[in-house]
A protein has these predicted regions:
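Intrinsically disordered, low-complexity regulatory regions enriched in Ser/Pro/Gly/Thr
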Residues: 32, 59-60, 124-126
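Structured beta-strand/turn binding interfaces of compact recognition modules in eukaryotic regulators
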Residues: 43, 94, 136
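Short loop/beta submotifs within extracellular cysteine-rich repeat domains
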Residues: 47-48, 75, 98, 114-117, ...
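A short beta-sheet element
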Residues: 50-107
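Generic structural signal for residues positioned in beta-strands
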Residues: 7, 36-39, 65-67, 90, ...
Length: 155
């Protein structure tokens, strides 16, 4: 297996949330229903989900993305569409579908890469995109996403 260093910005798209909802302005429910969606914030608990809210669905962020809390560096795979609070970026893989296994691998690598950052630093997108990750390589330049999935999936 060969490994290569990549800039996070060469592997991931860092997108702003489709809408920012402040906790003091929304009705947060404890339980999921058919009419509400996860409300992802900067917490380190419960996959970043503070609760569930019912808001304008055009502001939902896509499923199968990674939520990244900019001032806590908390990262979680989000398997369904979700709303966010303030300072949460939405990450997707460039040129490849993001699965839970691939996200788990990437988040582990990013946690290692961000381990020297101070908690409470509000990471701007330019800084985030320049952090280096070591990833398995498929060809000279392409990360091996299938291998990442196999490593996490156990086969």
């Amino acid at each position: 297996m060969k490994w290569k260093k990549y800039r996070t910005g060469d592997v991931l798209d860092f997108n702003s949330s489709n809408g920012i909802f402040h906790a003091c302005n929304v009705n947060i429910e404890d339980n999921k229903t058919e009419s509400n969606h996860p409300y992802v914030v900067r917490t380190s608990q419960n996959n970043g989900i503070r609760g569930y809210i019912s808001e304008d669905e055009s502001k939902l962020n896509p499923a199968n993305t990674i939520s990244f809390a900019q001032d806590t560096a908390q990262m979680f795979y989000q398997s369904e569409p979700y709303f966010t609070g303030n300072k949460v970026k939405v990450l997707s893989v460039k040129g490849h579908a993001l699965t839970e296994n691939i996200a788990t691998f990437l988040i582990t690598c990013m946690n290692k890469a961000f381990s020297n950052f101070a908690w409470g630093s509000s990471y701007d997108t330019k800084l985030l995109q320049n952090v280096m990750l070591s990833l398995p390589v498929k060809t000279k330049y392409i990360p091996d996403f299938n291998l990442m999935s196999e490593i996490i999936g156990g086969g």
